[in-house]
Amino acid sequence: MKLCFNEATTLENSNLKQDLELCEKHGYDYIEIRTMDKLPEYLKDHSLADLAEYFRTHHIKPLALNALVFFNNRDEKGYREIISEFKSMMETCRTLGVKYVVAVPLVTERKILKEEIKKSSAEVLTELSDIAEPYGVNIALEFVGHPQCTVNTFEQAYDIVNAVGRDNVGLVFDSFHFHAMGSNIESLKQADGKKIFIYHIDDTEDFPIGFLTDEDRVWPGQGAIDLDAHLSALKEIGFNDVVSVELFRPEYYKLTAEETIKTAKETTEAVVSKYFMKEA
């Protein structure tokens, strides 16, 4: 399995340029590029061509643009903005050689029926699939384990992906989000591993379902999530692609970027290596 770095892990103590240099130094294979902050910051002083050249001349490669945010159940103006943003992302993907865009569902205090959420999500993802197909880009739906997210369990997200029925539309499986809203491990064991495009690894303090927030994440293997169950299930269903470490821990932002990136790799590999070999 290949190792990826999600830039949320150094959100407040690094930038894209430094993330790339340190991930290259410490042997990461991939990086998920944050499009809402770190990429725009980089582009103030560099071009996309500069970034493409960096990837061309180094081991580390771009895995995904993270993320197309709140894509479903939008008003007409919001919908048009999502489509426009996604089309722009496709050009970025083409320039950099990115194969995935992470799509995050709407988070809202408004109550929306699950049927309406599924209908909107499937319709938008189908349109995005059509747009992405000529670029060879895949869309990875990331359910978010929070009560106010419109798609907040593995089962709900998997049902939407099945409704879309496109080869280039799949899931992000995030251990934190899976745990945070009580998704069922049996559902993962029965899933098609080909529908899981990216695995986000993390861990968390032991708060009740519905109370967990991103800031509660801790280094893999140092929290309450049964990562052994997640990893063994992923292996069982044939997933063996990329594991991406994603944390949002405020106290980790107080470390040096290098210490964060190094520790993230060490703790991830210690957990994952029990089930998957590191690919050369």
From Swiss-Prot:
Keywords: Isomerase, Metal-binding
Keyword Isomerase: yes
Classification via SUPFAM superfamilies: Xylose isomerase-like
Gene that encodes it: iolI
GO molecular function: isomerase activity; metal ion binding
Family membership noted in the UniProt record: Belongs to the IolI family.
Cofactor(s) recorded in Swiss-Prot or TrEMBL: a divalent metal cation
Functional pathway: Polyol metabolism; myo-inositol degradation into acetyl-CoA
Record text on cofactor binding: Binds 1 divalent metal cation per subunit.
EC number: 5.3.99.11
Function: Involved in the reversible interconverion of 2-keto-myo-inositol (2KMI, inosose or 2,4,6/3,5-pentahydroxycyclohexanone) to 1-keto-D-chiro-inositol (1KDCI or 2,3,5/4,6-pentahydroxycyclohexanone).
UniProt protein name: Inosose isomerase
Source species taxonomy: Bacteria, Bacillati, Bacillota, Bacilli, Bacillales
Binding site for a divalent metal cation: 142, 174, 200, 246
Cysteine-cysteine disulfides: none
Reaction(s) catalysed by this chain's protein: scyllo-inosose = scyllo-inosine
